[in-house]
Amino acid sequence: VKRLTKENSVVGIDLQDGWDRDHIDNTQDLLTCELNEEFDLIIHLAGKSGVRESINDPAGYWRNNVEVSKRLFARYPDTRVLYASSSSAYEPDLNPYAASKYVVEEAAERYCNTLGMRFHTVYSDNPRKGMFLQKLIDNELEYTTTHYRDFIHLFDLIDGILILIENPRITGTIDIGTGHPVKIANLAPELPVRINTPGEREWTCANIEKMKALGFKPKYTVEKFLTNQENDNIINLFNGETI
């Protein structure tokens, strides 16, 4: 948001504190709040994420991911909408989260000016609770898996989104990752490996050829992040502050 506000007028609607306007709380959400303003561009990153959590709350994931997105598409049919999809959408039958992302992509196809950004496994210095890497850093992880994941740092992800903003002719869906999957077990070889983890993809790897053609080049690696070679000195690209 800070990078966008340097040259644009930005309106944010979010559950988090910090917005100057259109902050919403737990008593209202994007299904009920007023959508009166018009925009040149909408970046829709809202929704519920998390594969395992979705198994316990499929209705909540459908409501927050599918119904909210459909409302935005219908309300702004002529506005360019970049929305957060997921690599999970490649196998929608595995879990409710993947299914919700796939259905959003299907709904978006009815509108000619939408782009689903298929984020792969995003990490940063301030992840949501329960994320694999945070548990690993906090020594709370009990086991690893045989999965391979394409980890992408939040700063690289933001660079990708900004590139897509500048390329309005790109529609449909597009992968945003590094193109280099990492074996989960290799990140913590001292921990036991669990083989059977239902509802999860065995392998994810972003095809970033389209993004590379637009000038996208990931800068960060998860291995260096975990060894603190970069983690302690990552500079906030938005305002020059260490985060």
What would you call each of these model-derived segments?
Residues V1, E142-I243:
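C-terminal substrate-binding subdomain of Rossmann-fold SDR/epimerase-dehydratase oxidoreductases
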Residues V1-L41:
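N-terminal Rossmann/SDR dinucleotide-binding element
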Residues I13, I42-A46, V81-S87, M117-F119:
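SDR active-site strand-loop-helix element
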Residues T27, L31-N64, S88-E91:
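NAD(P)H-binding glycine-rich loop region in Rossmannoid oxidoreductase-like domains
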Residues I42, N56-V81, E106-A107:
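NAD(P)-cofactor binding segment of oxidoreductase domains
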Residues G47, W62-S69, L82, S100-K101, ...:
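Short alpha-helix in the Rossmann-fold core of NAD(P)-dependent oxidoreductases
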Residues K70-A98, L115:
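Conserved Rossmann-fold NAD(P)-dependent oxidoreductase catalytic core, especially the SDR/UDP-sugar
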Residues P96-A98, Y102, E106-I158, L162:
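NAD(P)-dependent short-chain dehydrogenase/reductase
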